Amino acid sequence: MYVEAVRWQRSAASRDVLADYDEQAVTVAPRKREAAGVRAVMVSLQRGMQQMGALRTAAALARLNQRNGFDCPGCAWPEEPGGRKLAEFCENGAKAVAEEATKRTVTAEFFARHSVAELSAKPEYWLSQQGRLAHPMVLRPGDDHYRPISWDAAYQLIAEQLNGLDSPDRAVFYTSGRTSNEAAFCYQLLVRSFGTNNLPDCSNMCHESSGAALTDSIGIGKGSVTIGDVEHADLIVIAGQNPGTNHPRMLSVLGKAKANGAKIIAVNPLPEAGLIRFKDPQKVNGVVGHGIPIADEFVQIRLGGDMALFAGLGRLLLEAEERVPGSVVDRSFVDNHCAGFDGYRRRTLQVGLDTVMDATGIELAQLQRVAAMLMASQRTVICWAMGLTQHAHAVATIGEVTNVLLLRGMIGKPGAGVCPVRGHSNVQGDRTMGIWEKMPEQFLAALDREFGITSPRAHGFDTVAAIRAMRDGRVSVFMGMGGNFASATPDTAVTEAALRRCALTVQVSTKLNRSHLVHGATALILPTLGRTDRDTRNGRKQLVSVEDSMSMVHLSRGSLHPPSDQVRSEVQIICQLARALFGPGHPVPWERFADDYDTIRDAIAAVVPGCDDYNHKVRVPDGFQLPHPPRDAREFRTSTGKANFAVNPLQWVPVPPGRLVLQTLRSHDQYNTTIYGLDDRYRGVKGGRRVVFINPADIETFGLTAGDRVDLVSEWTDGQGGLQERRAKDFLVVAYSTPVGNAAAYYPETNPLVPLDHTAAQSNTPVSKAIIVRLEPTA
């Protein structure tokens, strides 16, 4: 049986969960070449038993992703339509549930035992393992311990701070992708009623680049495919995505596609286990057999080389079309539905294949094989995630990906399309509900008509802009609706200093995290219900809704007893805060919203495009799919009225002499900033997180050996002639299969290396996949 390296137990004296470990004791074994299997089942059950006990584990997992159950608080991969399997979850989904539904609690007594300074010295993993937050807490100026506060007093404190600001724009309101549609709608309504569009959210740090690129290309920032499209594609390209860890249920769909004859191309710097082979634990060959091979072609690309890859593929496709006109380019689609083809053709035929080889690190023969697979496919889906979105040229890269699909007419046809795979379970739904600093006029006008308010029109702060504003003293109140802002964001030292400049920080949270310890002069922790928790108002069970990565909207029903009677739902927190902030005469019916979420959904139906008759449609089994004009009717709501070919100068990430290009990534025991454990089973790491994966040739070149400990020092030219350096200390060197000149390490440990101002053009997403670093021996 799989055994964790960490030692955790509950202290008899303090009742704290010790969660002790020693980073120096980390061990490294060969990487795995298959994902899931029986071991994934064993780990799922082990984590459930540790956190929830047998009965609660059985009750929770039986309802996870079921039609009458709750949506997984992990990733945004969709449920398959129709009947559900008995176990409709993956290993990391089970871990997410175990973390949220744990029987451990963090009470007021816990905060009495531990000062903020003491807790600040604990690692993120230790903090999370203490359990669910059970009481609202306040830290006042001069105090060194959080102390209990009543809910009414907490609301009044926030309202007084907000109403005392000289401008609503001196407050920012952050959102995590866990927040439900109902809570997100109410939250943005509160914020716009207050008078600002300062609505940064977690999407700013991940798929903002996808939204920007797709909006330019096809007129909508969402993917165009369904589960059925993926299952019936001829060819699936998976670029910059690690489904085995980040979206494991996707592997089942890929398995079905393979059974239907699909070919799969994986494009990634690391040979991740889930890209190589999948052992489905619900099938015989996944238990006693060898499972299913995933990638027919593995393209081990250099970091930042994806734009060059797809530009090179575009050139080969265009050259094949010129040799045999009508054989490659879908002329009917391009002529009738696209703009900018001639400019794209001229630019792409000038792309040098030698340059493509240098930028990608692959051989011409492999590029030709991939091009041949694209030409042979009549139904192509291209999927991607952070490996494409977190580069300076991310928007241009995704435009290049879309160009290849447009050439072949692969938008708005069955079995084909774009598939940005979202990370957090409702991050796409939050945007649909209005969580964005620059919502379009159509949405704002509808909001104003429905509620009789006047929404501000000036764009607000995204995540990076919000940090800059706090840093510069232009924002003095920060409120986080979920998430772990201090650990999720770049440039840790700058971000933490920015938060500490605030007069008030408010965190609406399920569990203890670093953001509770990096605080303003006054700080509040407001404990909230999670997806798994039963939400009852006036004796009536409340339901919430979420939107997955493929625009399917469905209900989620928590069923477990909450951790305490002092925990409130996000909707209730928002609505009661609004009552304290605006008083009883406000035109928005906050009390009615707090008591009956159906009334919120009625308001959503009146405001949000595609959500008409929301209360009825969301109650249909499997829910409903939001409109997507390119998918539904080959209608492109762009500036040209057509799908636009993107034409950009070719960009990639050269490796400076004596340096490496570092990407930050998750371990298999991690979901965003939530650390489930200290092992990365697929990559062979056990018992620690401060490791850096480096090609053996680079290890030799730098005069190192595997097992050495080094500091990572990032170097960034700030555009004003200055060279900025940042340091992350004490990483174990691990020899690994990664392109020469490239390296990888886990976040949030490496977030201190990411400059706040090094962001993607157009999307302003931090560049976390192309950090220039040098290695120095740890002192």
Swiss-Prot record:
Binds 1 [4Fe-4S] cluster. Disulfide bonds: none annotated. GO terms for molecular function: 4 iron, 4 sulfur cluster binding; formate dehydrogenase (NAD+) activity; molybdenum ion binding; molybdopterin cofactor binding. [4Fe-4S] cluster binds at residues 72, 75. Its EC number is 1.-.-.-. SUPFAM superfamilies: ADC-like (SSF50692), Formate dehydrogenase/DMSO reductase, domains 1-3 (SSF53706). It comes from the Bacteria. One of its GO terms (cellular component) is membrane. The keyword 4Fe-4S applies. Keywords: 4Fe-4S, Iron, Iron-sulfur, Metal-binding, Molybdenum, Oxidoreductase. Was identified as a high-confidence drug target. NCBIfam families: Fdhalpha-like (TIGR01701). Belongs to the prokaryotic molybdopterin-containing oxidoreductase family. This is Uncharacterized oxidoreductase Rv2900c.
